[in-house]
């Protein structure tokens, strides 16, 4: 009888190990999934904050242009405002490089960054137009503004698709 008990104990040991490994794998899977959700949520907050900063800075610049159009701001003042604006936009552009997007969102980050690059270039041309009065500078600025808008729309669509789990 004692030998039978020994065999039973030995046969239970591999089953216990296999059960522990399976439980460990399940715990790891759910932990990894939770961590991915947390990273995704943190990334979503970071990109939203960055987009809001860009939108606010853009709004201030547009407001200054409106004042300049009404002759409430001189050309020199507008150029100074524009140069500070470009500095701010370039700092915001660098923030895109600091983001660590989940793989599904990398395309949207590239497009949103491209949009801001177009905006910066557009505003450089606009400032050059203010300085020189050369209408071709204004036309180029407007073209780049359109490209910026298109890149931003594509970036937002890509972001929403990634959020919904749609392959890109």
Features from the language model and the residues they span:
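Helix-centric, low-specificity signal for extended rod-like, repetitive segments
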Residues: 1, 30-32, 112, 119
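Hydrophobic membrane-insertion alpha-helices, especially the h-region
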Residues: 13-30
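Transmembrane signal-anchor/signal-peptide helices with a preference for the extracytoplasmic
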Residues: 25-45
